[in-house]
């Protein structure tokens, strides 16, 4: 993996399009302002969007694939400060461009596991899910919309606004009432297509071959819209409510 360095701020539209304009990050948490030229600029809330922009703008996609990059950078989100969540934080990340096989997903997960092991961080467990692809996700989205519509009066204002545009985001809401409703929502693994199922099973086989234990958690969707197929989180039981210490996934 080669180091990549990206600006601390980007055009706001980059995050609106990639992270998703119905996510908490874009709706509530970004630090956004207009520069002297009247352009909307945002401090980066995460590292992937800027890395992908740089990958495309600087022609890395014209070089031999896969391209593997890593970064360590500061990010900014207007969150309620608490254990494990500060408004300025550092994110270490890796991106693997141009690798479509399940082995690439397992490689990234294995790298994270090795990093934690080398740092002596214990008591983490890996949770894994697939959120499907553009081919199969519309059926799941329709099922979610039907389910949450029957609870619309109970949802928070933000989730009601997401009901028509992106009901999957409701699964990521931290409101206790919305979380309780989401607990009984349809699960995505009942809707994924055969190709996504094969990919997900392949990731599991590679992790088993590497000796990496995991549990399937069909409720993981991550908080950003660009993910497809594999999503994962490393979770700790030792740091309180905000238990996810590492997360990621595929974005085809």
Predicted ranges, named:
Residues 1-252:
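TRNA-recognition modules of translation machinery and tRNA-sensing kinases, especially anticodon-binding
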């Amino acid at each position: 993996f080669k180091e990549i360095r990206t600006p601390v701020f980007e055009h706001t539209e980059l995050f609106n399009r990639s992270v998703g304009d119905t996510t908490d990050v874009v709706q509530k948490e970004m630090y956004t302002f207009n520069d002297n030229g009247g352009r909307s600029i945002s401090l980066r809330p995460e590292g992937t969007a800027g890395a992908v922009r740089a990958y495309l703008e600087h022609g890395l996609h014209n070089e031999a694939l896969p391209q593997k990059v890593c970064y360590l950078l500061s990010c900014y989100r207007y969150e309620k400060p608490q254990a494990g969540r500060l408004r300025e934080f550092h994110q270490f990340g890796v991106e693997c461009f141009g690798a479509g096989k399940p082995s690439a997903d397992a490689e990234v997960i294995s790298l994270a596991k090795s990093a934690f092991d080398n740092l002596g961080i214990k008591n983490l467990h890996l949770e894994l899910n697939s959120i499907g692809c553009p081919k199969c996700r519309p059926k799941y989205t329709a099922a979610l919309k039907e389910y949450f519509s029957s609870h619309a009066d109970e949802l928070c204002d933000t989730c009601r606004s997401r009901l028509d545009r992106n009901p999957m985001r409701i699964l990521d809401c931290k409101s206790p009432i919305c979380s309780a409703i989401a607990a009984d929502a349809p699960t995505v693994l009942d809707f994924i297509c055969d190709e996504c199922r094969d990919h997900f099973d392949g990731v599991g086989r590679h992790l088993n071959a590497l000796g990496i234990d995991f549990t399937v958690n069909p409720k993981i969707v991550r908080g950003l819209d660009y993910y497809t197929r594999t999503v994962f989180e490393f979770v700790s039981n030792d740091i309180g409510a905000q238990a996810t210490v590492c997360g990621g996934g595929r974005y085809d």
